[in-house]
């Protein structure tokens, strides 16, 4: 049996093809190919008579296998993410976007690939607030974001739909910011997703804090997503489609806010492309940040 140790540690764990496969798939390699590479790595270590190996040795061998198979970009990404995780730098990813655009699915997939255990939806925060704040005190949190405008009393300047939306967001953002503060204070990795992740309302300060605005390419795309969503939800697609005008107005508002605050806007057309765009953006920005500290995250293993 091959056992794996971290340099400078006495703890040895059994080599796991499953764990290595997940590491390889995190950079966009198909799971079947990733598993075959993991087997090749294990077989080569066995052939060399290795019973104890370091994680660095596994990283180096895996990197070489990816390069040999022509996956140079994937090898670079693999090298980066292994080194990033080894540094134990807390990572905070914030995903905003309109109702039904696929934020939860993206968050779950990102969490799997990056080994992040904490995924928090802002709808859960809103639900907690509904239990402690009465409708009489704050009516806009007791309805959907695209219907909150109906609870606004008196006249508003500008769009009533956006006024209602902002009213709900400003309340939920208090809880979102509290979670962000705790994650930063305790050095936790987390992904926070939801329509209430709005630039200007949510704190994005911090070197390893990344916000993205996920949007639909078109009204038709979003409508199709609502029909798909009903396969896993009790709520009818018609509920959302009957309010598509309001939802699209909120999307336009979110795009404007994102551009104003320099937050990347990503059209969620294909899940894999969206995941790759987010991970590559995090990688590129982190590489630049680490360069300023004199660290080369892409130095080839020796």
From Swiss-Prot:
Pathway: Thermoadapter biosynthesis; cyclic 2,3-diphosphoglycerate biosynthesis; cyclic 2,3-diphosphoglycerate from 2-phospho-D-glycerate: step 1/2
Gene3D superfamilies from the UniProt entry: P-loop containing nucleotide triphosphate hydrolases
Cofactor(s) needed by this chain: a divalent metal cation
Keyword line: ATP-binding, Kinase, Nucleotide-binding, Transferase
Occurrences of domain ATP-cone (ranges): 2-89
SUPFAM superfamilies: P-loop containing nucleoside triphosphate hydrolases
Transmembrane segments: none
Class of the enzyme per the UniProt entry, highest EC level: transferase
EC identifiers of the protein: 2.7.2.16
Coiled-coil boundaries: none
GO MF term list: ATP binding; kinase activity; phosphotransferase activity, carboxyl group as acceptor
Catalytic activity of the protein: (2R)-2-phosphoglycerate + ATP = (2R)-2,3-bisphosphoglycerate + ADP + H(+)
Record function comment: Catalyzes the phosphorylation of 2-phosphoglycerate to 2,3-diphosphoglycerate. Involved in the biosynthesis of cyclic 2,3-bisphosphoglycerate, a thermoprotectant.
Similarity comment text for this entry: Belongs to the 2-phosphoglycerate kinase family.
PANTHER family according to UniProt: P-LOOP NTPASE DOMAIN-CONTAINING PROTEIN LPA1 HOMOLOG 1
Protein name stated in the entry: 2-phosphoglycerate kinase
Phylogenetic lineage: Archaea, Methanobacteriati, Methanobacteriota, Thermococci, Thermococcales
Name of encoding gene: pgk2
């Amino acid at each position: 049996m091959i056992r794996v140790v971290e340099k400078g540690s006495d703890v040895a764990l059994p080599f796991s093809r499953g764990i290595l496969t997940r590491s390889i798939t995190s950079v966009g390699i198909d799971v079947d190919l990733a598993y075959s590479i993991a087997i090749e790595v294990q077989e080569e270590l066995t052939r060399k008579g290795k019973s104890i190996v370091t994680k660095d040795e596994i990283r180096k061998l895996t990197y070489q296998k990816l390069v040999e198979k022509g996956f140079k970009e994937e090898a670079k990404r693999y090298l980066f993410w292994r080194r990033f995780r080894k540094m134990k730098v807390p990572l905070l990813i914030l995903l905003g976007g309109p109702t039904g655009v696929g934020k939860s699915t993206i968050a779950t997939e990102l969490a799997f690939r990056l080994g992040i255990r904490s995924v928090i939806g802002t709808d859960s925060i809103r639900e907690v607030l509904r239990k402690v704040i009465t409708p009489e005190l704050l009516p806009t949190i007791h309805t959907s974001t695209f219907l909150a405008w109906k609870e606004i009393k008196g006249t508003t300047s500008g769009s009533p739909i956006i006024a209602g939306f902002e009213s709900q967001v400003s309340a939920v953002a208090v809880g979102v910011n509290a979670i962000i503060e705790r994650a930063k204070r305790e050095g936790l990795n987390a992904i926070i997703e939801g329509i209430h992740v709005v630039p200007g309302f949510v704190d994005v300060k911090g070197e390893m804090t990344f916000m993205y605005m996920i949007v639909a390419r078109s009204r038709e795309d979003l409508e199709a997503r609502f029909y798909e969503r009903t396969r896993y939800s009790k709520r009818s697609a018609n509920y959302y489609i009957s309010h598509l005008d309001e939802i699209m107005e909120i999307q336009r508002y979110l795009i404007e806010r994102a551009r104003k605050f320099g937050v990347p806007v990503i059209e969620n057309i294909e899940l894999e492309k969206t995941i790759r765009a987010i991970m590559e953006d995090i990688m590129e920005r982190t590489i630049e940040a680490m360069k300023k500290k004199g660290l080369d995250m892409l130095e080839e293993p020796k």
